[in-house]
Amino acid sequence: MKKITVLFSVICSFFVVLTFLKDGFAGQKENIKDDKEIKAVYISYIELNSYVSGKDEETSKKNITKMLDDIKEFGFNTVIVHVRAFSDSMYKSDYYPVSNTVLNNKNTYPNYDVLEFFIKEAHEKSLKFEAWINPFRISNQTSLDNVSIDSPYYKFIKNKDAAVIEGKGVYLNPASYEVRELIVKGIEEIVKNYDVDGIHFDDYFYPDKKIDLHSYEKYKKDGGILSLEEYRLENITTLIRNVYEMIKVTKENVKFGIAPEGNIQNDYENSYLDVKKILASKGYVDYIMPQIYFGFENQTRPFKETLDEWNNMIKDESIKIIPALAFYKIGTTDKYALSGKNEWIENSDIIKRQILYSKSVSNYNGFSLFRYDYIFNENKYNENTKKEIKSLKEIINND
């Protein structure tokens, strides 16, 4: 009887240990899920032009590694890298020409896959990597001199689905089904072939109010009933829904998010992004990263009220808000802030306070800073920058 009692105790202990281990490992998995607070930095085509373009292989790799080391050592955990800034590609694509931002000192693509190297280095440093896409922009100049002969511009100009827009550059037509199909295929290529953690759009959607007039005229002739404004909003919503669906079918764990302009009225009236619709239900984005590049004292768009407005538009709890913050404004006059124009000069802890306030909103999941050079390139520092960096490090590393 004593032996049976001992055996029973051993068996019970075994199951207790198993239960503990199971719960323990489940807890570990939970801790590394996607709910982790995002602390992101943008690496734009401007940084790529400075540190990768025109460099030999050794130097470009060294510079990429340094950027990622800087970001990791500061305390960030995510990089948002310009993989397709001008309807081009950081890698060898079947749909887009190679980007000038990654051509080497011989003006050719280097002997390594730049995107693959970027991702591998980021992941080795425990950094998430999001591929940043500008879907419709081909150039920010009106001259075609720097537009590759392999650019989609030359395919779509035949049907007026590409245009040179005075004062803005060269763009594709958001109303074109074929243009949207190209964009989705180009992103699918990235998601299938590279271990990205996310796909990221910013605020470049409709470039002007003329590019799609011929498309709308045909739409009306074919029996379309939407107003011009509704038509444009639906074109962008359709693209976003198609990108989201493709990503979830291809690799469900890859996130999709958008960084629209912080001014919601401009999103509707200029970019034709229906932010209320895409934040109302699942199926469009995993996160929204509004560019709230405003100080607390901004006369027309004060930071707190603007962030609250964005947060309150989210109606599905699976969608998170990750405000993008204007590190580049530190120590400068913000003339558009009107009565609050000197706020960034008179204060040196604005970013810190913005992050702390952001943490209080219900759908908060992190923040991002625009952009790498303003944080790490001392040539861009001013009197306030180092003070802001010091206060920022205090909260990033104490979380």
How would you name each of these model-derived features?
Residues 62-89, 193-198, 283-287, 358-366:
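Catalytic domains of carbohydrate-active enzymes, especially glycoside hydrolases
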